[in-house]
């Protein structure tokens, strides 16, 4: 489930946690698109817990996911495009789109706490920020905006079921 308002996300999370068919789940927040003319590919700035990062196949192979507000984990492809050496402790400055309709952008300098080998065949390269940073800086998206295609600030979940039997029905039940 993705592009959820805070209220819908809270309801869904309670449902997921109570569902006996769910083995585990991951959660995240989509902050916005990474904005830099040196990117020759799509970049998404997000918060993700370990399960969510795993669902994107973007877990750091060196270092870890961000814990502190000024930390970031990202693909080596992004770092290379910015001319930054993939190394724990290096600083990287990133700009992302807070709200595409209002053309609002935010630029911050982060300390690299993790990275992985990027794959240029993948359409979107991920930047993981801490939960604290995401909550502090996310756009307060409304349900109406989500319906109209503004996903910045929307919450999302990935769900692993204990088995794949009747997968569509299980997902339908959680989504109600």
Segments and roles (model prediction):
Residues 1-176:
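Basic-flanked hydrophobic alpha-helices used for secretion and membrane insertion
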């Amino acid at each position: 489930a993705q592009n959820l308002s805070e209220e819908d996300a809270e309801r869904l999370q309670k449902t997921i946690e109570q569902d006996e068919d769910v083995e585990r789940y991951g959660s995240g927040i989509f902050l916005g698109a990474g904005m830099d003319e040196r990117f020759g590919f799509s970049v998404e700035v997000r918060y993700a817990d370990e399960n969510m990062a795993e669902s994107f196949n973007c877990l750091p192979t060196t270092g870890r996911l961000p814990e502190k507000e000024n930390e970031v984990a990202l693909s080596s492809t992004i770092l290379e495009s910015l001319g930054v050496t993939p190394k724990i402790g290096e600083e990287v400055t990133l700009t992302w789109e807070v709200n595409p309709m209002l053309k609002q952008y935010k630029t911050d300098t982060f300390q690299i706490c993790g990275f992985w080998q990027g794959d240029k065949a993948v359409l979107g390269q991920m930047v993981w920020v801490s939960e604290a940073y995401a909550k502090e800086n996310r756009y307060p998206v409304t349900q109406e905006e989500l319906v109209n295609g503004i996903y910045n600030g929307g919450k999302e979940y990935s769900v692993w079921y204990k088995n794949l039997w009747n997968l569509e029905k299980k997902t339908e039940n959680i989504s109600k």
